[in-house]
């Protein structure tokens, strides 16, 4: 059953006003879905505080993925699957955002070219400036949507999604046709991704588990950044807020694993 609007949504609007400002909220008052998605990752994002940036969270992810809290998924993937590569690889990264992972990979001699595809030109420009500063010449940047990109004319040794696949519609078609079309026969697909409920419509059991976890955290660590509010519980996310904030957010995420 869909939750259209919840207390969580009202609280989030208040928090976003304090963290990202009125201009960010006003950017959502448009019928242009692409502009909404782009604004979700604008410069004001730096004024937010997100749980996935917590070092201990990252260490746990590393441990769950690689077995070692100090080894991230990129290093693990390179060592386990690419160490025997016969020639430098050509990579396509879809929804690359700020390209922080691609900039790290580009420093590895295994990669001949990494094509970063994203709809946010500002983020790509920032990444290009960082690449120039680091002396990296094997990164290229393409500001297009997946509908505009010509998959048929390209061939890649590897295609990667890093927290971006859940922003694409019709995951089955994207992976089964478009990605398959541009991936070489022995090519690899790397996915580091949120694979939960579409539009974050978590079940009652999941919400209960989240609230149980919240109660384990001491109050000082539950204060919402740049506000005087403390997180006491999670009410569930409303479908409408997710859509208005970013129409691409978790749009087909429930189908990632089945695909």
What are these regions (language model features)?
Residues 60, 65-88:
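Conserved alpha-helix/loop element of class I SAM-dependent methyltransferases that forms part
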Residues 1-59, 67-72:
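N-terminal, positively charged/glycine-rich alpha-helical extensions of SAM-dependent methyltransferases
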Residues 150-158:
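A short acidic, Gly/Pro-enriched loop at the edge of an enzyme's catalytic core
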Residues 157-170:
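A short SAM/SAH-binding and catalytic strip from SAM-dependent methyltransferases
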Residues 93, 98-148:
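Class I SAM-dependent methyltransferase SAM/SAH-binding core
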Residues 172-188:
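A short glycine-rich, Lys/Arg-flanked "PGG" loop and its adjoining helix->strand segment in the class I
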Residues 190-226:
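Conserved class I S-adenosyl-L-methionine
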Residues 218-259:
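Substrate-binding/catalytic lobe of Class I Rossmann-like enzymes that use SAM or dcSAM, i.e.
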């Amino acid at each position: 059953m869909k939750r259209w609007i919840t207390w969580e949504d009202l609280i989030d609007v208040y928090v976003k006003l304090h963290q990202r400002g009125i201009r960010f909220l006003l950017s959502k008052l448009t019928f242009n879905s692409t502009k909404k998605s782009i604004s979700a990752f604008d410069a004001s994002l730096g004024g937010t505080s997100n749980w996935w940036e917590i070092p201990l969270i990252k260490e746990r992810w590393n441990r769950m993925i690689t077995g070692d809290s100090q080894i991230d998924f990129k290093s693990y993937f390179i060592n386990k699957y690419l160490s025997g590569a016969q020639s430098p690889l050509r990579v396509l990264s879809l929804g690359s955002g700020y390209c922080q992972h691609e900039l790290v990979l580009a420093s590895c001699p295994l990669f001949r070219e990494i094509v970063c595809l994203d709809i946010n030109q500002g983020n790509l420009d920032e990444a290009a400036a960082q690449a120039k500063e680091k002396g990296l010449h094997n990164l290229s940047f393409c500001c297009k949507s997946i509908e505009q990109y010509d998959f048929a004319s390209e061939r890649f040794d590897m295609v990667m999604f890093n927290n971006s696949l859940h922003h694409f519609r019709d995951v089955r078609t994207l992976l089964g046709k478009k990605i398959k079309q541009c991936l070489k026969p022995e090519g690899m697909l790397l996915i580091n991704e949120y694979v939960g409920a579409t539009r974050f419509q978590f079940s009652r059991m999941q919400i209960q588990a989240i609230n149980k976890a919240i109660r384990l955290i001491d109050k000082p660590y539950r204060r919402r950044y740049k506000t005087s509010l403390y997180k006491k519980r999670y009410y569930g996310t409303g479908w409408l807020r997710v859509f208005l904030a970013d129409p691409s957010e978790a749009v087909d995420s429930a189908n990632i694993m089945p695909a």
